[in-house]
């Protein structure tokens, strides 16, 4: 089990200790720093819904450093990002691959960021099947359906046409931050907090 840092804050009522993720949540920051599975997705969905209930008008900042993961788990987070009222600003630090890249692209338009040395990768969904031939066929058809769904989502958020997305995701397709900006996965490549805040302020005008 990874060690989770604790933050101690002083107040009029004395000291209060938070784990680092809870403290970030107070500032409307969600951090995905692992592969995506059902447990991780449920935590992120819960945080998104909580922050919406706290203030439906204030942006949520979603930092992503993820190699991807389970498609259905990632789709739960994606759908929640689109469902809630606040804009979700996304920031790639390290890498956003597979479902991580899709979530990065799904941020509010004009509020999708990459740090300069981040790596972004898109590809088609992975899957395996075993059992009777009819079961394998069902699983194969489902993977093909999910590939179409994911390609459609990437097309919607990047502005690339569906056929290009399908072609590019046929194999692992790696991009730098600048290349991801050109592709339409992010809107800005920023090296500092000041640059990010300036870009956000310009979007609000």
Swiss-Prot record:
CDD domains: S14_ClpP_2. The active site is at 98 (nucleophile), 123. GO terms for molecular function: ATP-dependent peptidase activity; ATPase binding; serine-type endopeptidase activity. It comes from the Bacteria. It is found in: Cytoplasm. Its main location: cytoplasm. Keywords: Cytoplasm, Hydrolase, Protease, Serine protease. It catalyses: Hydrolysis of proteins to small peptides in the presence of ATP and magnesium. alpha-casein is the usual test substrate. In the absence of ATP, only oligopeptides shorter than five residues are hydrolyzed (such as succinyl-Leu-Tyr-|-NHMec, and Leu-Tyr-Leu-|-Tyr-Trp, in which cleavage of the -Tyr-|-Leu- and -Tyr-|-Trp bonds also occurs). It is an enzyme of class 3 (hydrolase). The keyword Hydrolase applies. One of its GO terms (cellular component) is endopeptidase Clp complex. The keyword Cell division does not apply. Its EC number is 3.4.21.92. One of its GO terms (biological process) is protein quality control for misfolded or incompletely synthesized proteins. Fourteen ClpP subunits assemble into 2 heptameric rings which stack back to back to give a disk-like structure with a central cavity, resembling the structure of eukaryotic proteasomes. Belongs to the peptidase S14 family. HAMAP family: ClpP (MF_00444). Cleaves peptides in various proteins in a process that requires ATP hydrolysis. Has a chymotrypsin-like activity. Plays a major role in the degradation of misfolded proteins. This is ATP-dependent Clp protease proteolytic subunit. It comes from Desulforapulum autotrophicum (strain ATCC 43914 / DSM 3382 / VKM B-1955 / HRM2).
